[in-house]
Structures are given as structure tokens and as C-alpha cells.
Amino acid sequence: MSPELFFAALLLVPYVDCLTTALNDQLPLTPGEYEVFGNPKKYKEYFEYIRSYAPYNNLHKTNYPPMLVTSSIFDNRVLYSEPTKYIAKLRDLKTDNNVQLMKCKLEAAGHGGASGRDNAIKELAEEYSFLLKNAQIKK
């Protein structure tokens, strides 16, 4: 993973704590994912493999670009705790002054974001604004 390659990042309801999710077979989507990713509770090689690429498990002390990370309290695909836990660890480890924003949607919004055209446009405007502010475009 090479965070230095990016001037900014949008992580929109990201699946960043793959290993913890895969270890919890009480979550409704986890058992079905064993066919795709393997069962890390049952097989050590799947545990090690998932840990090798899981974003949460691969954070380390370094500079990270400015980030806008989103989640939704009503998302049943990526629990809001995953991005929240990720951003907390990232803030603890980062070695720069770049902003790491966390936005958790508390209104009815699922994995795909806000419903309704106006709300979707507002979200898109916030995301573009974040990227443009951090693009460091010179006049």
C-alpha cells in the first residue's frame, strides 16, 4: 500500500476491516463470503491471506493523504464501526498534519448513499469540494 501516491482520498463506505468481519460468522453476510474469501476461523492460510491485504491491519506510521471517509448507521453491508475504527487507528498512526474526516450518515441511507436526487447531488458536491480543496492546483 502506497498512500504517498495520492493527493487525497475518498473512502465511501469502505470495507476496511475485512478480517474482523470475516471472523464474525454471526454477521448475516459473512458465511456467504467464505466461498469467495475463504474461512479465516477454520483455515490459518485464509486468516494470514486476508490479514495481508486488509486495510485496517496494514495501517502503519507514515504520512497519509487527506481523506474523507463515510459510513452509514443503516448500512447492512459495511457496518458503520468498520470505517470508524479504521479512521481512529489511522489518526493515531499518521505522521503528518493532513485532515482525516469521518462522516457517518445518521439519516436513512444505506450502502449506496443518500436517497433522492437532491441528497445525492449534495453528497457529490461535498465529495468534489473535498477533492478540489486538496488538489493543490496552482493558478
Question: Positions of the model-derived regions?
Answer:
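Active-site-proximal cap/loop segments of hydrolase catalytic domains
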Residues: 1-139
